[in-house]
Amino acid sequence: MSRKGSTPQRNVLPDPKYGSETIARFINMVMKSGKKSVAEKIVYGAMNVIGEKNSNAIELLQKALDNVSPAVEVKSRRVGGATYQVPVEVRASRRMALAMRWLIDSSRKRGENSMPRKLAAELLDASESRGGAIKKRDETHRMAEANKAFAHYRW
């Protein structure tokens, strides 16, 4: 572990089409193997699909992220010989990162024929509080609720 402390968080430039930092971060998380143009096509394609069904795609993305973002999660903490799953609150930056990651992962598992359609369908579902990403959030909250007794082991 580094002794110099944590590195400062780098700021992300807003995306060229919508001028939104959130969408720029989303594109970066969709990206695989440095292929940013492919990731942009996927995200902008999904936004276009959403735009056909819904008036404001950016608002819908924000609503989906808010719905999926977890309030608490569990972290492993070793006490004596036992390992406890201790519930801890999630800070805002990690909350957004987890929400984006879960949306992308669950959209990749969907059955639609192209990634932009999969992502659009998952975003629409998440904005209406259903879908794979919402299940993941609920599962995380359930784990935290089940291990509430170990909350005093927080650090």
From Swiss-Prot:
This is Small ribosomal subunit protein uS7. GO terms for cellular component: small ribosomal subunit. One of the primary rRNA binding proteins, it binds directly to 16S rRNA where it nucleates assembly of the head domain of the 30S subunit. Is located at the subunit interface close to the decoding center, probably blocks exit of the E-site tRNA. Belongs to the universal ribosomal protein uS7 family. It comes from the Bacteria. Part of the 30S ribosomal subunit. Contacts proteins S9 and S11. The lineage of its organism: Bacteria, Pseudomonadati, Pseudomonadota, Gammaproteobacteria, Lysobacterales. SUPFAM superfamilies: Ribosomal protein S7 (SSF47973). Keywords: Ribonucleoprotein, Ribosomal protein, RNA-binding, rRNA-binding, tRNA-binding. InterPro entries: Ribosomal_uS7, Ribosomal_uS7_bac/org-type, Ribosomal_uS7_CS, Ribosomal_uS7_dom, Ribosomal_uS7_dom_sf. The keyword Glycoprotein does not apply. The gene is rpsG. One of its GO terms (molecular function) is rRNA binding. The keyword DNA damage does not apply. GO terms for biological process: translation.
